[in-house]
């Protein structure tokens, strides 16, 4: 389907509610329809998924880092709308003093927080995103990434498992560990996210299984630090040490002034950081309006532990920072910390009141 045909399909879809539909007007499309990025990408590469899947929420992916400049007339409007900001003035990266971040374990008793996780997305600045990558390029990028993994030592040391040629036993174990990612998302597939699958894809994790990296899943890199309990300081420190090691190894990550770190989907850019806990809040969750109000006040997203649009199980919720854009990495983590502490405080109050009534 040509770029013009894709746009016609979108333009004629009266019931489509995506941000792409809202912001990719005919005037804006016509202004960029003949432009190409330095990686060879077109506006059609960016809008394809949203045109084929009219039930998309966002509907647009960047075909490569340069798309955020070449197709800024559409992408900037989508970004401002999605991230609820008036202007694109994302600050310079700042992870703070991660060796001594000013916080520790959010739940020393271990009675409420089941686990803690912080992840970031990062993109190599010298490679395009999946729609414009050849098989040779994605394999070369995987090689660059593996070379950086070899610099990991101490707690970060581990092993890389490529998806291509993975044994059934390895696949079974990684699935059991919830480490394996799949190629079954139709939005990502139509965006070109699974082109040349499974070449160039893989998973690195450390020996303790508290740090892992997804290579070329959706983004070039998804770095994830996690562990049982509420020790946010340890989780954040490990992640920051890994990012620093990779940058010191010579990797350069794609950024744009005002937007921060660039990702395949514009919904993730900025800090591209998500800090979360799985926490037991059965008493507060039973007071749905109050729970929602606290989450909104502190910019916390609450969802079921199996991801977006899933229900809570046994009063356990996934609580994370809602904002990715317009604040530093350290501020994003602090925002999650503050919100979680308030939720924890209220849960303890409600549990105490319940106990007093008995």
From Swiss-Prot:
It catalyses: L-arginine + ATP = N(omega)-phospho-L-arginine + ADP + H(+). It holds the Pfam family ATP-gua_Ptrans. GO terms for cellular component: extracellular space. InterPro entries: ATP-guanido_PTrfase, ATP-guanido_PTrfase_AS, ATP-guanido_PTrfase_cat, ATP-guanido_PTrfase_N, ATP-guanido_PTrfase_N_sf, Gln_synth/guanido_kin_cat_dom. The keyword Lipoprotein does not apply. GO terms for molecular function: arginine kinase activity; ATP binding; creatine kinase activity. Residues 2-84 form the Phosphagen kinase N-terminal domain. Substrate binds at residues 57-61, 218, 265, 308. Residues 112-350 form the Phosphagen kinase C-terminal domain. The keyword RNA-binding does not apply. Keywords: ATP-binding, Kinase, Nucleotide-binding, Transferase. It is an enzyme of class 2 (transferase). ATP binds at residues 115-119, 178, 222, 274-278, 303-308. GO terms for biological process: phosphocreatine biosynthetic process. Its EC number is 2.7.3.3. PANTHER family: ARGININE KINASE 1-RELATED (PTHR11547:SF38), ARGININE OR CREATINE KINASE (PTHR11547). Belongs to the ATP:guanido phosphotransferase family. This is Arginine kinase. The lineage of its organism: Eukaryota, Metazoa, Spiralia, Lophotrochozoa, Mollusca.
